[in-house]
Amino acid sequence: MCSLAAGNGRGAELGPEPLELSDSGDDAGWEDEDADTEPAHGRQHTPCLFCDRLFASAEETFSHCKLEHQFNIDSMVHKHGLEFYGYIKLINFIRLKNPTVEYMNSIYNPVPWEKDEYLKPVLEDDLLLQFDVEDLYEPVSTPFSYPNGLSESASVVEKLKHMEARALSAEAALARAREDLQKMKQFAQDFVMNVDVRTCSSTTTIADLQEDEDGVYFSSYGHYGIHEEMLKDKVRTESYRDFIYQNPHIFKDKVVLDVGCGTGILSMFAAKVGAKKVIAVDQSEILYQAMDIIRLNKLEDTIVLIKGKIEEVSLPVEKVDVIISEWMGYFLLFESMLDSVLYAKSKYLAKGGSVYPDICTISLVAVSDVSKHADRIAFWDDVYGFNMSCMKKAVIPEAVVEVVDHKTLISDPCDIKHIDCHTTSISDLEFSSDFTLRTTKTAMCTAVAGYFDIYFEKNCHNRVVFSTGPQSTKTHWKQTVFLLEKPFPVKAGEALKGKITVHKNKKDPRSLIVTLTLNSSTQTYSLQ
């Protein structure tokens, strides 16, 4: 799943450097310690960086390294200015290359663990990789331990060490001040975005959009490419086909409304199983191709095509028996097309009629993908030798739509929204929800992913369900990923409590603003 991947352990070659990489410890002493290194049943232990002793925590391991091997992780982190990813690389470098303590203490910049290959864990569930390196960034009160042979310059070295400690402390204080300033900016941004949303009329935003405001949305569906992608999505298209073909009683001799018909595929499915009349509505230019498609398949006597927004057109009937639509967007609600379906339901659906799909859920799941997080976030720390870390503040607030590797999941999913299309209203589509993610792996939590499930249930003799989750067959909806600014360690069995708020963006009501609170940290994301 998403636990830290196992590696080849100790004893690997360091590389071309002519260095002695065996530990200077006494082998004979190890056998005497074996009796003390057996882990208690059911407890997680991790080995020392320089010998075979096992410990139950990172703190115990580092204390042992300092006392027995003269390796001070505090000094090492401060000496090289290591943050989250640098620390991860350091630990994996030592695990993989098995260098001596003397070699590690002799290293100056550039360090040998800069490559991204050292982001890959060597030991599964390594407790040292779950240690919060920021805990080490307190004012430095003890000098660094430098190699022997510099005693003749001791006074100069001491002064330099104290100057370096003061510089590091000042740099850390400046970083904290910048972070506080950014939090203030983020708070102001979140406040403005949420006020915008709360003050808008969510029951009419989509219906009230003018042609010049909504033209880009509909023009994007005028090109064949997006329809080709959707039609080739077998999970999507075959689920609709199976629902209609396996439940013909729902459509036979009924009047059907297809909202956002596109190429007309759902309308043709309905016509094939005996619908009396199908009214297909779409505002995009693809409707003209749909007209040709309907004629080619000799269904023009059953299917009536109407170009325009469902909120603006006049239908040739007062009421319909069935409404069908493929309205789902990323994270289910992106594009706000469900608003149009609900509008059609309230205006045109006959008493006792049905809307399909009828049930939808949105779920969240925790993700651990340190390498991908580094690629997206740590990348900006050094771009061809230049510091572009300020770009992180622009990258993190944008939700990412991508396929999540199911092996990176570290929790059970949690439903945050249940929608019954027969009873829900447009105002229900903006919501807040508390959630709890039960972790299944010990790892670093780097992101939260969202997805949705779709159900065709009402009056069905053969129920049809499909999921867009990471553990199901890939769909064109993929998953929506909310990257965490600061990953944090979790242990298997933990209950991660959080809160999510989903609103339309007032300036663009087809896009979403998502505010996520997790691990005492709040971040607002845009999906647009």
Curated annotation (Swiss-Prot):
Residues 1-43 are annotated as: Disordered. It catalyses: L-arginyl-[protein] + S-adenosyl-L-methionine = N(omega)-methyl-L-arginyl-[protein] + S-adenosyl-L-homocysteine + H(+); L-arginyl-[protein] + 2 S-adenosyl-L-methionine = N(omega),N(omega)-dimethyl-L-arginyl-[protein] + 2 S-adenosyl-L-homocysteine + 2 H(+). The active site is at E326, E335. GO terms for cellular component: cytosol; nucleus. Its EC number is 2.1.1.319. The keyword Coiled coil does not apply. Residues 184-528 are annotated as: Mediates interaction with ALDH1A1. Disruption phenotype: shRNA-mediated knockdown leads to elevated osteoclast numbers and osteopenia. Inhibited by N-ethylmaleimide and high concentrations of zinc chloride. InterPro entries: ANM3-like_C2H2_Zf, ANM3_Znf-C2H2, Arg_MeTrfase, PRMT_dom, SAM-dependent_MTases_sf, Znf_C2H2_sf. Its main location: cytoplasm. Residues 214-528 form the SAM-dependent MTase PRMT-type domain. S-adenosyl-L-homocysteine binds at R236, G260, D282, S284, I310, E311. GO terms for biological process: methylation; negative regulation of protein ubiquitination; negative regulation of retinoic acid biosynthetic process; positive regulation of osteoblast differentiation; transcription initiation-coupled chromatin remodeling. The C2H2-type zinc-finger is responsible for substrate specificity. Protein-arginine N-methyltransferase that catalyzes both the monomethylation and asymmetric dimethylation of the guanidino nitrogens of arginine residues in target proteins, and therefore falls into the group of type I methyltransferases. Catalyzes the asymmetric arginine dimethylation at multiple sites in the Arg/Gly-rich region of small ribosomal subunit protein uS5/RPS2. Also appears to methylate other ribosomal proteins. May regulate retinoic acid synthesis and signaling by inhibiting ALDH1A1 retinal dehydrogenase activity. This is Protein arginine N-methyltransferase 3. It comes from Mus musculus (Mouse). The lineage of its organism: Eukaryota, Metazoa, Chordata, Craniata, Vertebrata. The gene is Prmt3.
